[in-house]
Amino acid sequence: MTAAVLDCFASLAMTAHDLTPDLAARFAGIALGHVTREYPHKLDQVLDGPEDLLSPRELHPIFFGSFDWHSCVHGWWLMLRLRRLFPELAAAARIEALADEMLAPAKVAGELDYLDRAYSGGFERPYGWAWLLALHAEAQRHPDRPWAEDLEPLARAFAGRFQTYLPKLTYPIRVGTHFNTAFAMILALEWAEPNDPLLADLIRDRARDYYGQDRRCQAWEPGGDEFLSSALTEALCMRRTQGDEAFRGWFAGFLPDLASRAPPSLFAPATVADRSDGKIAHLDGLNLSRAWCWRSFAPALEPELADLARKTADEHLAASLPHVAGDYMGEHWLATFAVLALEA
C-alpha cells in the first residue's frame, strides 16, 4: 500500500466507525491486490505422492491468492459485498470483470476436483467451508451475474461436509482460531436458512447442545495467536441460532457480570506486538471480530448493556482498524473482519 493510503488508515482511530464509500474503496483496492497474488502462499494439503506437489494455482484454479485458500475465499466475499453495497464504487467494474473470469464453471470444477483427492476430508474444516458458504450466499444477492449458479456445486459440497461433520463432533472446538465451531456455524446458518433447511435445523440443534448449559464464562482470553473471541463468538452464535428471547435468558447466565465490566478481558483491546508476525497479527483480527460480536448482539440487550457493548466495540475498532493495511500478514485478510464489524 502507498504511504498516503496507510496515512488514511492511521486516521481511522479518530473517526466514526461506519462503513463509508471511502472505506469501501480502500478495502476493495486491498482485496483486488491480493486475491490473484499467488505468492507467498501457505497450502493446506496432505501429500499422497510426489505428483501432488503442484503450485497453488494448479491446485486451486480460483482460490490460489491471498496467502491461503480461506483468505482468498473471503477476499472474494468482501469484493462482492462491496460491489453490492456500493454499486457506484470505482472498483466495481474491475470486481465484475475479475469475477466473470474467475467464478466460472470450469474453474469451479477444478476446485471440486481438489475435494476428491485422498485425505481431503479435513481440508479447510470448518473455517474455509463456512466462508465458501458465505461467499455463495453473497453471490446470490447479485442476480445480474451467474456467479451464484456457478458456485452452487461447490457450496453444496461443503454443505454436505457440514451435514456429516457436525453430528460426529461430540464437543465444540472453542479455540479462537480457524477451528472454532461457533464461528463456522454463524456463517453456515446464514447460507443454510434459505438454501438447506435441514442443515439450518442441525446447526441450531448443535449450538444448543454445545453451548446451551454454559454458565459464568471466565473468558480466559485472548490466546497469543487468536483472532476470534471464544466467549463472544459463542454468544453471537447463540443469538443467531436460538433467537433473541432465548438468547437473553441464556446470556444473563453466561456473562452475568457484564454491567460491572467483567470479565475484564473482554473489554480490553488486545495489544499487537509485531504485525509482521502472521500469528501475532491475528490479534488485530481479534479486536475487529470482538467489535463485530459486541455490535451484533447489542440490539438484543437492555439499553444500558447495549450502550456498553457499542462503546466497547468502538474501542476495539479504534485499536485495530488503522492497521488493516501495512503488512501482508494482516493485509491479506483483515479487511474482511473490518467490514463485518463496521457493517454490524
Describe the role of every protein-language-model region:
Residues 16-64, 328:
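Low-complexity, Ser/Thr/Pro/Gly-enriched N-terminal "stalk/linker" regions
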Residues 73, 82-191:
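Extended ligand-binding groove/face enriched in aromatic
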